[in-house]
Design a protein with these regions (language model features):
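Exposed, interaction-prone extracellular/peripheral surfaces
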Residues: 1-31, 37, 47-55, 61-63, ...
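A short beta-strand signature within small-molecule sensing/ligand-binding domains used
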Residues: 69
Length: 305
């Protein structure tokens, strides 16, 4: 896959596809969050009157005039909300991107679709790519060209991986700590990964740290999946699968392929449960076949709460 192909896909998204039409009506900044207070701009100060919310009272300003007169702070939630794609760029993902796999195309479509939708409602968009280190960080900026620049940054990583192959797994703690130390303002954080590291190791995610971030930021996780990877097409009942790290093929039986697929589905369901109940993070599993409707339904369900 080449960068020109991705730009062409993004231009198609820009001119309107089914998913974008559904998601354009959703302002991502409207999602509710556990974060309170500092996400608002102070518009002005005036006298508090009975019937107005008690939480608006500025007690520090009212100390000298209490109880005869109380003052309130008028706050307004900013319409602009920075969006940051937190994208898994481990060796396996970069390999899939270079090969143009369905899962890789799904990732790029999601970045293009959501990114351009955010740009259309004048929200700055950025990128945080990670493996077991921070691979790239693009600060959120306004405009459609920013989304194309993000795609270009990802492809530069692909080219670097081609020239100087490195085996790097996804360590989710790395971006979480980066976010905790660097992002002072509230963001929408869109975590995109195939979650294979969690499938292989349940301890791959620090749910406590994730919960701390989710309390401050509007956070969601989009889990990439492709059931077709383990569909047996051979009449002999065997399937060839690629080792994402070595580019070698392995032949496995239909029974083993089915067992692997069931394990992946079970672990992904477990991951979604733990994300919700341990960290308060909404998530959805998206496939190349269902992502158009599933993404729109997921976002609409979040705004309805």
């Amino acid at each position: 896959m080449e960068i020109e192909e991705v730009f062409a896909r993004f231009r198609n998204i820009k001119h309107g596809i089914k998913t974008r039409k559904k998601s354009t009506s959703i302002h991502y900044g409207d999602h509710k969050s556990g974060f309170k207070g500092a996400g608002y701009d102070i518009v002005g100060v005036d006298q508090w009157r009975p019937g107005q919310p008690l939480k608006d009272i500025a007690w520090v300003l009212s100390l000298r005039t209490y109880p005869e007169k109380l003052f309130r702070i008028e706050r307004m939630e900013p319409k602009e909300l920075r969006a940051l794609f937190v994208v898994d760029l481990s060796s396996s993902i970069l390999f899939q991107l270079s090969q143009g796999s369905n899962k890789a195309l799904l990732m790029l479509d999601l970045i293009g679709n959501i990114g351009l939708t955010r740009a259309n409602v004048r929200d700055p968009v950025g990128l945080l790519g990670f493996s077991d280190r921070i691979e790239t960080f693009v600060k959120p900026k306004l405009g459609n060209p920013q989304v194309f620049y993000i795609a270009k940054q990802i492809f530069e990583k692909i080219e670097l991986q081609r020239r100087f192959p490195e085996k790097r797994a996804a360590n989710f703690t790395v971006p979480f700590r980066f976010i905790a130390s660097r992002l002072k303002n509230r963001h929408t954080l869109i975590l995109i990964s195939d979650a294979i590291d969690f499938v292989n190791d349940r301890a791959a995610l620090d749910f406590k740290l994730l919960g701390t971030l989710a309390a401050k930021h509007d956070m969601m996780m989009l889990i990439l999946d492709d059931p077709e990877e383990f569909r047996v097409r051979s009449s002999l009942g065997y399937i060839r699968i690629n080792d994402m790290e070595t580019d070698r093929q392995t032949v496995i039986s239909a029974r083993k392929a089915g067992a692997i697929r069931r394990t992946i589905e079970e672990r992904m369901s477990e991951l979604q449960y733990m994300l919700k109940h341990k960290s308060g993070v909404d998530s959805v599993v998206l496939t190349p076949q269902n992502h158009g409707d599933a993404l729109a339904e997921f976002l609409i369900a979040r705004t309805a709460r």
